[in-house]
From Swiss-Prot:
Stated name of the protein: Myocardin-related transcription factor A
GO molecular function: actin binding; actin monomer binding; DNA-binding transcription factor activity; molecular adaptor activity; transcription cis-regulatory region binding; transcription coactivator activity
Function: Transcription coactivator that associates with the serum response factor (SRF) transcription factor to control expression of genes regulating the cytoskeleton during development, morphogenesis and cell migration. The SRF-MRTFA complex activity responds to Rho GTPase-induced changes in cellular globular actin (G-actin) concentration, thereby coupling cytoskeletal gene expression to cytoskeletal dynamics. MRTFA binds G-actin via its RPEL repeats, regulating activity of the MRTFA-SRF complex. Activity is also regulated by filamentous actin (F-actin) in the nucleus.
Biased composition (Low complexity): 340-365, 715-727
Organism encoding this protein: Mus musculus (Mouse)
UniProt-listed Pfam families: RPEL (PF02755), SAP (PF02037)
Comp. bias intervals (Basic and acidic residues): 251-266, 796-810
Residue stretches of biased makeup (Polar residues): 186-197, 497-508, 764-779
Positions where Phosphoserine occurs in the chain: 41, 159, 174, 191, 349, 351, 355, 358, 371, 423, 484, 487, 492, 496, 520, 530, 544, 548, 605-606, 651, 687, 718, 724, 728, 810, 826, 840, 892
Keyword annotations of the record: Actin-binding, Coiled coil, Cytoplasm, Nucleus, Phosphoprotein, Repeat, Transcription, Transcription regulation
Length: 964
């Protein structure tokens, strides 16, 4: 053991040395610390330097020792404990000091200045306008400083050892101190901006300083304080301007407040150590805060919040005003944009409250969207992004939740890329969301809110939200392209639900402006899913339409080639459809002749009603064929616009539906119905600026450039009829079709000018397999005739011919049965003028005979061009206007196999063809709803003036919409 001990010791020493060597400082460190001399400097110099440093340190320490405070001071500063006093006394003194400090802090917090005072002293950053209003004294608020003066006892509460410490916390006198006494706005409310950080109160007696006034800070304009729980949290909201102003508190009130505060203070100040105060002399601690300073702070907070809100509202209004001023000449600012059709669904964000306001005529009509629509959803991008400022571009990006960083070019590219993603189908013209919808030079764009149309128009079936903007563009071809800002394609193949807007009915409001123009809401099912819808222009009310003739090139993006191809396809489809219609018309005519032979006077009357109803259906369909390309703004070439006067087979029949109102500018009161046919003819033969007069007397001037030279020829040759004549396809031979003869309610000459003669009766029957008569159809006819006899429209001896093919593919016959002559004309009968096929010249005479015999009233002959309506027309018109059927015609499924005569008390007699067997046609795919697919769901919201029930879906399929 003794031998091992030295060895173990050596090993331990070695390990320690080794560890120290590893941890020793480098020479550089030793030199820097002055422990070792530098290698390059002599050792003597190093020693001298070290001695100097030691002497300096010694002198410093000596000075500190000499200047250190006395023990009493250290005891007072609580650095040293007081040994002379009793320990119990020391403990009590400490407790008392702490309690006093807490009381002082509580008082300062309770009497802290309110947000208004902080704003006035530049402590609280707010917007300059708000700050100016507060400082200048526009807003009066109760000042907490009024009641914040201290009693003379405030310093007495401090122990003798504490003066310096408390004084250090005292408020620092500020140069703006005098401002505290300025009359500060008094108001009943202030924002929740409570300021926690209070500057300590001055202990000196009578001193009223609250805030250590800091040099004025430039107010951060976008950082109004939003306060929670008495703490200031600056947020990015702009502070509102001040609108409420209260009377400044009178000096007497202020003095009363200060006295009250002084009375409440002594509760803590008078307490010295364990002094006893009887309960009756004790004062409620909570009362003073609520009564004086705390209540004032709450008032200031409420007032401040109100001011912020008002300021924000004012700023928004000013910004909107500025944008509105800039909109007229320049692209709209994003804030004033109303969502356009180019934005997919967000474009439906127009608030209904703002839509009606846009109905005011004028180029800025759309610009007057109320601010409620502001910033709701991004609208269409302005065309001139390059001209916009970076701030505007960033605002556009923010509206679309896109990043706003980058150069101007990057911002523009980002916006355009986003717009490309959300823009509608290429063929759809983009209706600018800007205030004025501008079109190309040759076009007139009529924009109006869908909400104005929804009351009586067919827009309801189109799925248009009332808030959407509807833009109708009358192109140079005379075609009206109708686009809604909503991009969702209407799914319903519902036939035209004619809007009663132009009928002058009490239910039609001036907002219904384009009601008649927009008879067929179905747009996207026809040729392409574009939000554009083609409109039949029937007298629109100028009041609700904003004609912005200014050209805006938003519509220039259409692919010309694609448009031409689609136009060709549409023409072919329309031609084929018209041929089928002609066949149906011929079949109907043959049936009517047979019926007339069997029941000479009676059959004539029965056919007339069918014909009228049917013609009304045709009217709705044919106008489309005639130059109204419904899908994606297809414009039918002028070849189809050929003179409608001549029954040239080329031009699709333009249905001249004149519903009791001559289209002439001087519309008689009875001629209140501007029929879709008029709009159709107008579109086809676009005449120079056309004045459309509605029954209400409102005038809409549509300047449409006409590319079809043949268009000028009016069927009746009376140029005075601006709408109906220009394009009235009424062939000369069937004079009854002349647009000028609106009084002929029973027939509107469809003048379906087909390229081939209508097939014979046998051929038509063979082509239509399911045209065999149904027993139920004859039963329905009997019911119809019974109703007619009861109403006195036909003679009692009138009976329906026993044989009436019920399944005939020409539902037109059934559709025509909404007899215009019935006292309660159904929406089907609302189109009094049926369009008999041009091929049957004798039919008009029979119809006239029937009408004259059944009503005893003379009919207006086809040659009659005078504007004065006939008594029969007046009667029909008055019936139509007075009939609730115009408004309330429930949708009914169409069955080609049966003729449903569903006399409904509210809607009068409405003929609904239920299409039971849709040969090779699956309407269910197209039906927007309903068990069978109501081809003509005449919704109560959008009653139709004529029924499309006569159309068979066999060949129409998707093109059903186009025939509207």
């Amino acid at each position: 053991m003794t031998l091992l001990e030295p060895e173990m010791l050596m090993m331990a020493v070695q390990s320690v040395l080794q560890l120290k060597l590893q941890q020793r400082r480098t020479r550089e460190e030793l030199v820097s610390q002055g422990i070792m001399p530098p290698l390059k400097s002599p050792a003597a110099f190093h020693e001298q330097r070290r001695s100097l440093e030691r002497a300096r340190t010694e002198d410093y320490l000596k000075r500190k020792i000499r200047s250190r405070p006395e023990r009493a001071e250290l005891v007072r500063m609580h650095i040293l404990e007081e040994t002379s006093a009793e320990p119990s006394l020391q403990a009590k003194q400490l407790k008392l000091k702490r309690a006093r400090l807490a009381d002082d802090l509580n008082e300062k917090i309770a009497q802290r200045p309110g947000p208004m005072e902080l704003v006035e002293k530049n402590i609280l950053p707010v917007e300059s306008s708000l700050k100016e209003a507060i400082i200048v004294g526009q807003v009066n608020y109760p000042k907490v400083a009024d009641s914040s003066s201290f009693d003379e006892d405030s310093s007495d509460a401090l122990s003798p050892e504490q003066p310096a410490s408390h004084e250090s916390q005292g408020s620092v006198p500020s140069p703006l101190e005098s401002r505290v006494s300025d009359p500060l706005p008094s108001a009943t409310s202030i924002s929740p901006t409570q300021v926690l950080s209070q500057l300590p109160m001055a202990p000196d007696p009578g001193e009223t300083l609250f805030l250590a006034e800091q040099p004025p800070l430039p107010p951060a304009p976008l950082l109004p304080p939003s306060l929670a729980n008495g703490s200031i949290v600056p947020t990015a909201k702009p502070a509102p301007t001040l609108i409420k102003q209260s009377q400044p508190k009178s000096a007497s009130e202020k003095s009363q407040r200060s006295k009250k505060a002084k009375e409440l203070k002594p509760k803590v100040k008078k307490l010295k150590y364990h002094q006893y105060i009887p309960p009756d002399q004790k004062q409620d601690k909570g009362a003073p805060a609520m009564d004086s300073s705390y209540a004032k702070i709450l008032q200031q907070q409420q007032l401040f919040l109100q001011l912020q809100i008002l300021n924000q509202q004012q700023q928004q209004q000013q910004q909107q005003h500025y944008n509105y001023q800039a909109i007229l000449p320049a692209p709209p600012k994003p804030s004033a944009e109303t969502p356009g059709s180019s934005a997919p669904t967000p474009s439906r964000s127009l608030s209904t409250s703002s839509s009606p306001s846009s109905g005011t005529p004028g180029p800025s009509g759309l610009a007057r969207q109320s601010s409620t629509a502001l910033a709701a959803k991004p609208g269409a991008l302005p065309a001139n992004l390059d001209d916009m400022k970076v701030a505007e571009l960033k605002q556009e990006l923010k509206l679309r939740s896109l990043p706003v960083s980058g150069t101007k070019t990057e911002l523009i590219e980002r916006l355009r890329a986003y717009q490309d993603q959300v823009s509608p189908a290429p063929g759809a013209p983009k209706a600018p969301a800007t205030t004025s919808v501008l079109s190309k030079a040759g076009e007139v764009v009529v924009a109006f809110p869908a909400a104005l149309l929804s009351t009586g128009s067919a827009l309801v079936t189109a799925g248009l939200a009332p808030a959407e903007m509807v833009v109708a563009t009358v192109t140079s071809n005379g075609m009206v392209k109708f686009g809604s800002t909503g991009s969702t394609p209407p799914v319903s193949p519902t036939p035209s639900e004619r809007s009663l807007l132009s009928t002058g009915d009490e239910n039609s409001t001036p907002g219904d402006a384009f009601g008649e123009m927009v008879t067929s809401p179905l747009t996207q099912l026809t040729l392409q899913a574009s939000p554009l819808q083609i409109v039949k222009e029937e007298g629109a009310r100028a009041a609700s339409c904003c004609l912005s003739p200014g050209a805006r090139a938003e519509l220039e993006g259409l692919d010309k080639d694609q448009m031409l191809q689609e136009k060709d396809k549409q023409i072919e489809e329309l031609t084929r459809m018209l041929q089928q219609k002609q066949q149906l018309v011929e079949l109907l005519r043959l049936q009517l002749e047979q019926q007339k032979r069997a029941q000479q006077p009676a059959p004539a009357s029965s056919p007339v009603k069918r014909e009228s109803g049917f013609s009304s259906c045709q009217l709705s369909c044919q106008p489309q064929g005639s130059a109204h390309a419904f899908g994606s703004g297809l414009v039918v070439p002028t070849t189809n616009h050929g003179d409608t006067q001549a029954p040239a087979p080329e031009s699709p029949p333009v249905v001249v539906k004149q519903e009791a109102g001559p289209p002439e500018p001087d519309l008689a009161p009875s001629s209140q119905l501007l029929l879709g046919s008029q709009g159709t003819s107008f579109l086809k033969r676009v005449s120079p600026p056309t004045l459309v007069t509605d029954s209400t007397g409102t005038h809409l001037i549509l300047t449409v450039t006409n590319k079809s030279a043949d268009g000028p020829g009016l069927p009746a040759g009376s140029p005075q009829q601006p709408l109906s004549q220009p394009g009235s396809p009424a062939p000369g031979p069937p004079a009854q079709m002349d647009l000028e003869h609106p009084p002929q309610p029973p027939f509107a000459t469809p003048t379906s000018l087909l390229k081939k003669e209508p097939p014979g009766y046998e051929e038509t029957v063979t082509q239509q397999p399911k045209q065999q008569e149904n027993g139920s159809s004859s039963q329905h006819m009997d019911d119809l005739f019974d109703i007619l006899i009861q109403s006195g429209e036909i003679s009692a001896d009138f009976k329906e011919p026993p044989s009436l093919p019920g399944k005939e593919k020409s539902p037109p016959a059934a559709a025509a049965y909404g007899p215009p002559l019935t006292p309660q004309p159904s929406p089907l009968s609302e189109l009094p003028q049926a369009a008999p096929p041009p091929g049957s010249p004798t039919l008009p005479g029979r119809l006239e005979d029937f009408l004259e015999s059944s009503t005893g009233l003379p009919l207006l002959t086809s040659g009659h061009e005078g504007p004065e309506p006939l008594s029969l027309i007046d009667d029909l018109h008055s019936q139509m206007l007075s009939s609730s059927a115009i408004l309330d015609h429930p949708p009914s499924p169409m069955d080609t196999s049966e003729l449903h005569f569903a006399p409904e008390p509210s809607s009068g007699m409405g003929l609904d063809l239920a299409v039971g067997h849709l040969d090779s046609m699956d309407w269910l795919e197209l039906s927007s709803g309903g068990p069978v697919l109501s081809l003509a769901p005449l919704s109560t919201a959008a009653p139709s003036l004529f029924s499309m029930d006569f159309l068979d879906g066999h060949d129409l399929q998707l093109h059903w919409d186009s025939c509207l």
